[in-house]
Amino acid sequence: MKQIIYITLAKNQEIEVWKLHDDFSLNLLQRISTQGEPQPIIISKDKKYLYIGVRPKFKVYSYKIKADGTLTKHACSTLPGSPNHFEIDHTGKYLFSSSYHFNCLSITPLDTLGIPRPVTQTIKNIFGCHASKMNCYNTCLFISALKKDCIYAYNFKKNGKLLKNTRKNFMTNVNFGPRHLDLQKCNNRLYSVNELNGSVDIWSINSFSNELILLKNINIMSKNYCNAAWSSDLHISPCEKFLYVSDRIENTISIIKLEKDVQNIEKIGHIKTELQPRTFSINSTGENLIVVGEKSNSFSVYKISKITGLLELKNTYSTGNRPVWISSLML
């Protein structure tokens, strides 16, 4: 297998395609103009297409992924707001676009050829709509509303519609600002990173009602740190034993060891990393973590210890200007 890395460059209005080798060296395969400022990217469930959200003309572009990982432009569709996060349901038929500045979430159908079709539904008045995450059963979409300190849950139907009258509200503490979400399938838990507070909330998901119950809050900032936080991204390792969280004030990635007993879940360490680490990616085998620095204009590759979950820096490479999103693909 080979690992391909996709990085969006907001200021350059480009996407870079890199190949990661077994010795952790990389080579640049391709650089493509995106005809606008690229923001979120996501790979289709069948690994055949890459979707990129751009602004100021709000669109989602699809690119065909060739056998070597390089891209060819395929199609595009208009979005109702500036995209900042994408999610795809488990069937691979529907793309959810969160818009923080336009306070909405939209649904774009994806046809069998990977073409994004016109938006079929827009949910408005989700203030600070930052990200979404589908539950294990493809029946409920969780959506973060950063400006409201809230996570919403909407029932999702097989016809690709969210039922607005089923919305449930789950509040964080005031001025926490829930941002990105991830799901731990083995324990049916939702994890949310709080941008303004520098912490992670751990939620239990009721398998029948999709109600969230807050189990624990974990601080990710340095000991005795008491200033403003600016936390951004989080990802659970494929083995579901470790959680990684980035913060853009301290320029760190924190490592949290996950346990079945929530009382035993704790932060086990952190590393200094790129300047302003807005997003990062863990490959599907759980062997490496790659983080981009929005201010450092570079990205770093870390080897993940499968025993301890700790990170070992293996390489750093320069990118174009303002890398804001990264995704990894095993081919």
UniProtKB/Swiss-Prot annotation:
Catalytic activity: 6-phospho-D-glucono-1,5-lactone + H2O = 6-phospho-D-gluconate + H(+)
Pfam families: Lactonase (PF10282)
EC id: 3.1.1.31
UniProt-recorded Gene Ontology molecular function terms: 6-phosphogluconolactonase activity
Gene3D superfamilies: YVTN repeat-like/Quinoprotein amine dehydrogenase
Lineage of source species: Bacteria, Pseudomonadati, Pseudomonadota, Gammaproteobacteria, Enterobacterales
Family: Belongs to the cycloisomerase 2 family.
Keywords on record: Carbohydrate metabolism, Glucose metabolism, Hydrolase
Keyword Hydrolase: yes
The protein's annotated pathway: Carbohydrate degradation; pentose phosphate pathway; D-ribulose 5-phosphate from D-glucose 6-phosphate (oxidative stage): step 2/3
Any GO CC annotation of this UniProt entry: cytosol
Protein name per Swiss-Prot or TrEMBL: 6-phosphogluconolactonase
GO BP annotations, alphabetical order: glucose metabolic process; pentose-phosphate shunt, oxidative branch
Functional description taken from the UniProt entry: Catalyzes the hydrolysis of 6-phosphogluconolactone to 6-phosphogluconate.
